[in-house]
């Protein structure tokens, strides 16, 4: 199996290959048959659906273990960890700092953290130093790059926030509204559990103090705390106000007392989980990177090739670094790979596809 090099990436981008793909199967860290807990969505629901089992060809029940959006966020954070490490790679990012404020802790948000990347409202509503004054980011030279960016001219965005060209961007809150810059995701990844069977989960709490419901009534105080004294309680129309949404003043409303054991649906056993990552080369080839004062021709073609290769390399690096961090998705949902991480270059028939290996160190080189 061949190492994946930058020259191979350039050849793939310059040719007609369809995509780079990495498919990895997993089992729960507790072993086959151990229960895993998927993410919950509104109403405490799991994302279940029927899919064709890629191994048996049968239609089976599946559950989503990590969504496309979540995987993109994890890849961005994997890149951020690499950038923060000593001797890490260099990558253009935006960063806004909330220093010199009354916040209890200092907060820093980068374009690898913000949900909408460089087009996020956090950056839109921030100030940037330009010359001898501070101006709103979108009114600055860097901010106006978004106004000028599209598929035919992504040069400025490549220098400002290249991950936006990889993970996708829609500048829907900018001055052009819904007509703002829009770039599709070039890389898509998700983890799905196949052969999913829902189980049960239990919940309870034993209070070592054995505080009973009838022990006392609990009242609100003016400073947001609680008290057992009516005299110290916050009052509404002359009456002491009890804690709790229903105003019952129970000890359980301030997290004391036992919680009776309960049983509900929760967790799944699965036959296996599969992580599928696809990096679309046609999506990258749609991007154009004109140079200032360029007359086109050979210079433009070379600029397009190099810029596209950078985006593909960035995607390979992000996905590889994420896999090497491990698949500990959330509490009670740790997965262990069943094999090595292999990238496949999907070529258009009759050309044959090729497989490659790359590790995190190589991906960052």
Regions found by a protein language model. Name each.
Residues 62-72:
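Extended catalytic/binding region for NAD+/ADP-ribose chemistry, centered on the ART fold
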Residues 71-81:
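Short active-site loop/helix that positions an aromatic residue
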Residues 1-38, 42-63, 83-86, 93, ...:
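Basic polyanion-binding and macromolecular-assembly surfaces
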């Amino acid at each position: 199996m061949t190492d994946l090099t930058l020259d191979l990436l350039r050849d793939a981008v310059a040719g007609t290959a369809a995509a780079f793909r990495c498919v990895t199967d997993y089992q729960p860290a507790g072993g086959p048959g151990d229960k895993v807990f998927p993410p919950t969505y509104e109403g405490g629901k799991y994302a279940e659906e029927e899919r064709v089992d890629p191994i048996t060809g049968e239609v089976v029940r599946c559950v989503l273990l990590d969504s496309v959006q979540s995987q993109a966020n994890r890849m961005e954070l994997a890149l951020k960890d690499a950038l923060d490490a000593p001797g890490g790679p260099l990558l253009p990012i935006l960063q806004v700092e909330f220093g010199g404020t009354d916040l209890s802790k200092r907060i820093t948000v980068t374009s690898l953290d913000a949900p909408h990347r460089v087009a996020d409202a956090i950056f839109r509503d921030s100030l940037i130093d330009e010359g001898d004054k501070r101006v709103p980011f979108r009114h600055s030279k860097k901010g106006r790059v978004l106004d000028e960016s599209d598929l035919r001219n992504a040069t400025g965005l490549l220098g400002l926030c290249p991950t936006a060209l990889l993970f996708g961007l829609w500048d829907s809150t900018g001055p052009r509204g819904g007509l703002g810059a829009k770039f599709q995701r070039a890389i898509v990844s998700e983890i799905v559990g196949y052969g999913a069977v829902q189980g049960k989960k239990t919940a309870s709490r034993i209070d070592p103090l054995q505080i009973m419901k009838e022990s006392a009534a609990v009242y609100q105080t003016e400073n947001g705390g609680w008290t057992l004294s009516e005299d110290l309680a916050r009052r509404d129309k002359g009456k002491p106000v009890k804690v709790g949404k229903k105003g019952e003043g129970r000890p359980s409303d301030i997290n004391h007392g036992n919680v009776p054991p309960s049983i509900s649906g929760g967790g799944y056993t699965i036959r296996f989980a599969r992580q599928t990552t696809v990096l679309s080369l046609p999506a990258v080839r749609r991007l154009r990177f004109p140079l200032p004062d360029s007359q086109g021709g050979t210079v433009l073609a070379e600029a397009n090739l190099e810029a596209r290769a950078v985006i593909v390399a960035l995607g390979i690096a992000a996905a590889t670094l994420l896999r090497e961090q491990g698949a500990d998705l959330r509490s009670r949902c740790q997965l262990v790979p069943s094999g090595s991480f292999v990238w496949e270059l999907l070529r258009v028939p009759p050309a044959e596809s090729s497989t490659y290996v790359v590790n995190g160190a190589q991906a960052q080189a």
